[in-house]
Regions:
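Flavin (primarily FAD) cofactor-binding/catalytic cores of flavoenzymes
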Residues: 2-45, 75-431
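A short acidic, helix-capping loop that chelates divalent metal ions and anchors anionic groups
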Residues: 68-72
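Redox-cofactor-proximal catalytic regions of oxidoreductases
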Residues: 40-64, 251
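A short small-residue
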Residues: 62-66, 378-380
Length: 431
């Protein structure tokens, strides 16, 4: 069967691939979007049951469609988010083909462009957009060996408390996923140990405005790079149960045991860094700094927003902070499960072109790779802090589509003298 030809192949039909399709269509660029599973599959099957979007409905959406929920301040459940993307594909008539996996992309030896092998046949294309995002392969540290009576799963495999065996739970990682899962388990009556590393801890809301609004008006969504020394700092924010500021001191007051970064495992014991107090202090400082900036903004503009003294209240230091736990014998304290909320890595093994660094990360500028014709979409900090959010990837997709359209204008350019000669030939031929 001959290879199918199209201009641009978009790999992945999550939020990035769908946004890419909309902007390519706006430019009239022929394209196909391939998805190995279903549209927005990760939202349906790689998240826990109670997950909601971390931003309110008015914010975490594409500009051209609202969520069906009439409450625009609601945090949308994961299934409704997936349905939103399915509906959006229909709205823009995106050429999505599900159940097709891209196996290999190589540069063509002649004629320019790329040869693409997929489970649904071969393609010849001029441009590739890798819209698979950054959250592909779960990272589980090879720290604790398998053992009878100890269940170990990554956060992407966690669904609900009933899934775990009876007993205490160790959660490693206190970003948004780890913090939300740990709180859910605690509220379900489990004894939870939470390993807390460096983190940002923004207020869920302050003085009547969600933190997404504050990051917008304060210009923080448009930061192009992380601050010095914060490249690997995670963000702890939650929309669960209507949305509430993640406060690790509050967790401890309710019975959760906090520990520092997980470092090693020896003879049945986990060992933790002596950094819990510093990590909590830096998270608190981040929280208060945003409140201070918000207050200054309100005063400068003379806004009539209500005071919010509750957001500045601080829970007392718990015993686990003043007398930190440095080692934990899992059997002794009854830990029967470990949940690794330790992030994800990228897998671009199918993309066999020279545009990756020594660590396998894409070399690109705002999604435009160093390999002509190859583009990336959905990466954290692709162009700004907001790039990982639904609205942010939509704007990044526009930039990438505009770049592809510009390349088209170069390829179709003809000098005026040549164009006039071609017109004359055409007139004679049709004379």
């Amino acid at each position: 069967m001959p290879a199918e030809k199209t201009d641009t192949l978009v790999v992945g039909a999550g939020q990035a691939g769908i946004a890419m399709s909309e902007h390519l269509s706006a430019h009239g660029i022929a394209h196909v979007v391939l998805e190995r599973d279903r549209i927005a599959e990760r939202w349906r099957t790689s998240r826990w049951d109670s997950l909601v979007a971390n931003g309110p409905a008015w914010h975490d959406r594409f500009p051209n469609r609202d969520f069906d929920d009439p409450d625009h301040d609601a945090f949308i459940p994961k299934e409704a988010v997936a349905d939103y993307f399915v509906d959006y594909v229909g709205q823009i008539n995106a050429p999505v083909r599900c159940g097709v996996e891209v196996e290999q992309v190589t540069r063509r030896r002649a004629g320019g462009g790329f040869d693409v092998k997929t489970t649904g046949g071969d393609f010849e294309v001029q441009h590739i957009v890798a819209a698979t995002g950054a959250f592909q392969d779960p990272v589980t540290p090879a720290l604790v060996p398998p053992a009878d009576g100890l269940m170990q799963i990554h956060s992407n495999a966690y669904r609900n408390p009933a899934q775990l065996p009876k007993g205490a739970v160790m959660v490693v990682g206190a970003g948004s996923s780890g913090a939300q899962i740990a709180e859910e388990l605690m509220n379900a009556g489990r004894q939870v140990y939470l390993s807390v590393g460096p983190h940002d801890r923004p207020p869920r809301a302050y003085r009547g405005r969600d933190f997404c609004w504050w990051l917008g008006v304060l210009g923080k969504w448009d930061m192009q790079t992380p601050g010095p020394g914060t490249e690997h700092v995670t963000i702890a924010v939650s929309g669960a149960n209507g949305g509430r500021t993640v406060d690790f001191r509050r967790f401890a007051a309710q019975g959760m045991q906090l520990v520092g970064r997980t470092q090693a495992f020896r003879e049945g014991q986990l060992h933790f860094a002596d950094d819990l107090r510093a990590n909590i202090a830096k998270g608190d400082a981040n929280h208060l700094s945003l409140l201070d900036e918000a207050d200054a903004y309100i005063e400068r503009l003379g806004l009539d927003l209500p005071p919010d003294p509750e957001e500045r209240k601080r829970w007392p230091d718990p015993a686990c902070l003043t007398q930190p736990i440095r080692t934990l014998d899992l059997a002794e304290v009854g830990v029967t499960s470990i949940i690794w909320a330790t992030g994800f890595s990228c897998d671009y093994s199918w993309l066999q072109v020279d545009t990756f660094d020594a660590n396998g990360k894409p070399i690109h500028a705002r999604g435009v790779s160093k390999e002509p014709g190859i583009y990336f979409l959905g990466l954290p900090w692709q162009s700004r802090r907001g790039s990982s959010f639904i609205w942010g990837v939509w704007h990044d997709a526009k930039f990438v589509a505009d770049h592809i359209a510009t390349q088209h204008s170069y390829l179709t350019y003809r000098p005026s003298q040549q164009s006039q000669s071609e017109d004359t030939v055409n007139k004679v031929a049709t004379g």
